[in-house]
Amino acid sequence: MPFSTTEISTAGKASLDHYLKNNPIDQVALDRVWLRQLMKRKKPVPGGKQYVTAQVRYKYQNNGQWFYGNEQVTYNNRESLEQAQYPWRSMHDGYAISEDRLAQNGIIMTDGPGRNASKAEVLQLTNLLDEQNEILRLGTEEFMNEQCLLDGTQDTDAPVGLDGLVSLSPSSGTVGGLAASNAWWQNHAATGLTTTTTTGTILDKMEIAWRACVRNGGRPDFIMCGSDFLDGYRNFMLKSFGTLNHQGGSEISIEGGTKMVAFHGVPVMWNPSFSDLDTTYSPATAWEKRCYFINARHVWMAPLQGQDMVTRKPPRVYDRYVNYFGLTWRGAVVMDRRNAHAVISIS
C-alpha cells in the first residue's frame, strides 16, 4: 500500500526535527575539537545588515596625575572602543530521496491520498530516514568544523575561521574590518620551534607565547595542536626531563601510553582534523605542526537568532520525482581580542 507524496515529505521533516532534538548539532563528536569548543560558547545574535559586530577595547586613555593642595587637574574625553565586524554567512546541507530509491527499499509513493501504508513500509521508511538524518548531521559537523578552522579564502561565501583570526602572519591584512597593523590587534605567532632533546626551543617558545596571551587577555584555557606538534612536545619533555624511580629489590609495572599532555595545567588537545586540512590544502606551514593557545572568553560562534541549524523541507519540483530535506545555518565566528591568543609551530 503506498504513501502519499505529502506523507513522505512530512515524515522526513518530522523525523529530521526529532533526530536533531535528541541529537543536537552542538553535541559534537569529540574528534571535532574546534567546533565543539565554539559551540560551547555560542552566543546567538539578532540579524542585522551583513555583519556581526563585537566591541573591541583597544586602549584606556588613562589621565592619572599627581596633585597637591589646590593645584589644577585635568579631565579628558575617552574613546576606547573600536568595532570589529564579521560578515555573517549562510550554510546549507541536505539530501534527496528519489521515488526509485524508495521503491528499492520496498516503499511505494503515489500522488494519491495516502494513509494506507503497511507496517513493513513504515518500518522501511523509518530506517531509511534515520540513516539519512544521521549522516546529514555528521556530514554537517564535519563541514562546519573544517570551515571554522580555515581563513575564509577557500570560498567567497565562507566565514573567517581560526586561521584568519589567529594568524601565522598576525600583522598582515585586516581582521574583522580592523587593520592588523595595529599592535593591539595582533595575536602572538612563532614558527620554527625545535624539539631536539635537551636543546630544543619548544618549551621556551611555548612559555613566551603563554606570557604574551596572559599579558594581553588572561590565561589561555584551551590548547589544541596537530599530531607532529603533540609528538614533538611529548617526546621532548619525556626525553629531556623524564625519570623512572625504582627501589632495588622490588617489582615494577611498566605500561605504555600517554594519559594526558598538558601545559600550565591546560590539557593539550589533539585535533585529528588538522591532518585532513594538510591533505586538502597543503599549506606552507602544516596544520599538523601547529599549536594554538586560545582564550575561549574572546572567541565564539555567533549564529543569527532563529537561524541556528534550521530544518528545511523544500517543495518537490514539477520535473523531478524527488523529495528534498535540508539544514541551514547563518552566522559567523567572532573574536573581540586577538592579542589574547597565540599560534606556534615546530620546524
Question: Which ranges hold each PLM region?
Answer:
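Flexible, glycine/threonine- and acidic-rich loop/arm segments that mediate assembly and lattice contacts
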Residues: 1-289, 294-347
